[in-house]
């Protein structure tokens, strides 16, 4: 209408909107934070603000501790206790960020630093480079002969919210997201050592330095040199000649190791593998040929079948699996049998118009409390695949939850297990479940296990994948996409797979269209005979 058109015109012409500024001025700046706490909606926040003058999480915590929240109508002691626990959980995670929360800022800043005419080499180090699921800060290493110019550009970058410190070789800022970001400026000769050291992990670095010392060398964040006489004397061999080191490949080679990818640098077997030429060739993002576990407007997605297919084609994928929620997920507008069959028919019809691309018809089927599935076998048999997931009763004991999930995996129509631990990073801990038992069940039943690539999940965690791989369990990387823009989050799942030592042979959706069709057909045929 005219009112909205006028507001759009004002935004375009002035870059601001008086209506929005006036609206924002009516409320305290921190009050919107209250919406991030579970159980608090607009009505309860309004009551807290009007009755108790609560306008921030800190003030709410004070009111809870004083017992005043429990006295409000519609709250009570139980709600007060839940809010206290939620605030305590939030404090526990203060200063931590999901990898996906800060990836856009990190990559943009890295790109802009690399574009600087005086930057010779630029790389993000730290836990971000190692693809840890939780990141506390960002470390940028830049090789340059003009440190002052690089530092000035860094602290003046548009993403910088505030400058913490600025010096000739190190500067620290806080970005708009709230994460602290450190810049270390080094020479080209120092760069490989600084990059390796600040990438970590601490445990990895200790072993790297130990291996250097055994050769009569000392290694730090700036150089490789001869060890002090007292240190070298402990090593029974004379110091070896120090090689020229121009990059990390040459650094590891000097230690008689294959290059160790950053994702594996946790001192969890990578040195033994690198010394014996047994490091895996890790999966790359370009190895993916398609994906499953995507939602549409039929349930709680934001885009139609046609739009999701078009987005997948634009990304160069050969196939896309549609897995809208099943009927028990009422909060997600889960499909009943009739609506599921309508969608199945739509997918079959759309596939008639594709060349070298296919939509697979599936469902994200709720695993009910007793381990049964949300649809009868006759319905599931009509689909191309089934994602089985837990969406309720998270507080079962470990034994009961494990039995529940294993029973679901034993259903012959289940293709893959979705987000196996139910965790929401920095928000909800995994439910109690025996993951080794789940992996054993997957190996026995041939069930694929998902890496849910949504940044808030990254589940199954990378720490479990070496065991799963050892047992012969196959992985499938899924974005759990509820919109076309979320398909690109597959990249986050690839990071988890790499950190879990997986190759493209371990990941089912690295198969091209013809082979994944055959694999799905074979799996259903084998399972029917179980």
Place the predicted regions along the sequence by residue.
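Charged catalytic cores and adjacent phosphate/nucleic-acid-binding surfaces used
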Residues: 131-217, 221-296, 302-322, 327-357, ...
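Accessory alpha-helical DNA-binding modules that contact the DNA backbone or grooves
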Residues: 2-171, 178, 192-193, 206, ...
């Amino acid at each position: 209408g005219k009112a909205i058109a006028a507001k759009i015109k004002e935004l375009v012409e002035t870059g601001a909107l008086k209506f929005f500024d006036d609206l924002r001025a009516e409320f305290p700046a921190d009050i919107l934070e209250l919406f991030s706490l579970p159980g608090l909606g607009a009505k309860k926040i309004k009551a807290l603000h009007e009755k108790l003058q609560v306008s921030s999480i800190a003030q709410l915590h004070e009111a809870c501790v004083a017992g005043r929240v429990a006295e409000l109508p519609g709250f009570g002691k139980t709600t007060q206790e839940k809010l206290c626990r939620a605030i305590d959980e939030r404090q526990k995670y203060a200063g931590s960020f999901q990898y996906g929360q800060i990836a856009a800022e990190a990559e943009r800043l890295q790109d802009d630093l690399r574009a600087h005419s005086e930057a010779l080499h630029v790389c993000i180090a730290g836990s971000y480079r190692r693809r840890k699921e939780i990141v506390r800060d960002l470390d940028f290493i830049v090789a340059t002969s003009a440190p002052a110019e690089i530092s000035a550009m860094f602290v003046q970058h548009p993403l910088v919210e505030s400058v913490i410190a600025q010096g000739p070789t190190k500067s620290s800022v806080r970005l708009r997201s709230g994460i602290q970001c450190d810049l270390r400026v080094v020479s080209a000769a120092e760069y490989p050592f600084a990059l390796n050291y600040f990438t970590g992990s601490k445990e990895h670095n200790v072993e790297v330095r130990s291996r250097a010392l055994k050769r009569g060398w000392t290694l730090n964040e700036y150089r490789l040199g001869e060890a002090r006489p007292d240190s070298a004397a402990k090593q029974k061999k004379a110091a070896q000649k120090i090689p020229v080191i121009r990059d990390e490949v040459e650094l590891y080679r000097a230690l008689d190791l294959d290059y160790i990818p950053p994702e594996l640098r946790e001192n969890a077997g990578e040195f033994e593998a690198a010394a014996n030429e047994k490091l895996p060739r890790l999966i790359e993002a370009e190895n993916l040929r398609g994906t499953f576990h995507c939602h549409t407007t039929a349930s709680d997605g934001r885009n139609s079948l046609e739009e999701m297919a078009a987005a997948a084609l634009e990304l160069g994928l050969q196939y896309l699996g549609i897995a809208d929620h099943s009927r028990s997920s009422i909060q997600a507008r889960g499909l009943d049998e009739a609506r599921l069959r309508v969608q199945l028919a739509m997918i079959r019809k759309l596939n008639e118009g594709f060349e070298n691309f296919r939509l697979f018809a599936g469902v994200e089927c709720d695993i009910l409390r007793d381990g049964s599935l949300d649809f009868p076998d006759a319905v599931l048999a009509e689909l191309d695949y089934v994602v089985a997931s837990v969406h309720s009763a998270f507080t079962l004991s470990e034994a009961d939850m494990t039995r529940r999930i294993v029973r679901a995996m034993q259903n012959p129509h289940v293709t893959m297990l979705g987000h196996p631990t139910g965790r929401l990073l920095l928000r909800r801990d995994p439910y109690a479940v025996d993951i080794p038992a789940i992996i054993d069940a997957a190996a026995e039943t041939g069930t694929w296990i998902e890496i849910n690539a949504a940044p808030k999940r990254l589940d199954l965690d990378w720490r479990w994948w070496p065991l799963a791989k050892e047992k012969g369990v196959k992985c499938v990387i899924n974005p759990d996409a509820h919109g076309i823009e979320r398909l690109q989050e597959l990249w986050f799942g690839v990071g988890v797979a790499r950190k879990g030592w997986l190759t493209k042979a371990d990941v089912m959706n690295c198969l091209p269209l013809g082979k994944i069709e055959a694999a799905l057909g074979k799996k259903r045929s084998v399972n029917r005979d179980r």
